[in-house]
Amino acid sequence: MNQFRIVADSSCDILSLDGADFVSVPLTIRTDTEEFRDDDFLDVNEMVTVLRSTKGRSYSACPNIADWTEAFGDSGDVIAFTITSSLSGSYSTACAAKKHCEELDPSRRICVVDSLSAGPEIALLIEKAQSAMCAGADFDDVCRDIQAYREHTHLLFALESMHNLAQNGRVNKLAATMAGVLGIRAVGQASSEGTLEMLGKCRGQRKTQEFLLHEMERLGCKGGSVRIGHCQNPSLALELCVEIQHRFPGVEVKSYPLRGLCSYYAERGGIMLGFES
């Protein structure tokens, strides 16, 4: 079996990977008075609570070049995954670290993948890389296959709150406040360019669920793997699991709590859904 290290920034929500040499590189969430490092010591629920009451600016900070260089290690081949470059500088710093490591040791091969997404969709890419590695695929073939596979994965999200997006200037504060008051959930997707694209608005959990299922069908889901990350919303995640299994027979679906960075964007009640087409 060809062995290589898999590295990803913490937007993937994965801290460890059974049977693989895996390293998570933390992003950081900051306010004027608090800092939350998205590692295995982070209390996500506490972070969510603090951010809900934050009146000032909040923002995320990407890993620096030294963080990525340390994660890549001193030798061996590496495939690395980052949150979409449209939301973060993580891809840029990872590429700079790749260049540095390959200059130190020209025999190394480091592939950095801009996921153009976050959370559950990155998890699917990582699982694909691990599966290919376990099957003994050549490193260069794995890198090509991941880029091709990325064309057939998607991310949908549904947000109960847009407080943090408003606090870091990504959405209008008045619109975010009104949506919260009216109980409107924003549903969107990661576009093919890696931007956040709003698709519609729903009121209530059932309508949100139906909207997500409809969008999965529209985007070509017929089965395969589905990953659902939630921020303090296990009930919707469970209902989605059941409905997805009913609507797409043979689908393999898993749900889990989001970690720090994705919980920052999804906020309490939010759902992120990655799937194949």
Where are these regions (language model features)?
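Generic enzyme active-site microenvironment
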Residues: 7
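Short catalytic-loop micro-motif centered on adjacent basic/acidic residues
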Residues: 59, 80, 112, 227-228
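Glycine/charged-rich beta-loop-alpha catalytic/anionic-binding loops adjacent to active sites
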Residues: 76-80, 103-113, 255
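Mixed-charge interfacial surface used for oligomerization/domain docking
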Residues: 2-3, 11-29, 33-34, 87-90, ...
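Class I S-adenosyl-L-methionine
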Residues: 34-103
